[in-house]
């Protein structure tokens, strides 16, 4: 029995001293799937005023039933969440960034998660951007 315990202890000691493999050099490189998802999540709008674009994002999210958690105009960042139907136990979270581009347009990226999993369905983003476009158009007409 003592010999067996000594062998097990020695094996554990050697296993504890083993070096983990070095991280891959492309660890932070985006995959093709991530690039495709990013293209679904991003749209350019003909709005020169960043504040107006952020107000449009907030209005759109509220119209879609989201509760705004944070809105940071200097960073162009809006986060929101809502409970998902039909059971209202699942949570949908959205983070939207608004960045100005050199040509006077705004680049809007929406990132949605459903129960801590990224939403990859194109229709979700198409519906959001269609609603945002309507909101921005109405906002422009009211001025």
Residue ranges and their predicted role:
Residues 1-7:
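Bacterial N-terminal signal peptides that target proteins for export
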Residues 13-16:
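C-terminal motif of bacterial Sec signal peptides marking the signal peptidase cleavage site
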Residues 18-143:
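Ser/Thr-rich, low-complexity intrinsically disordered terminal regions
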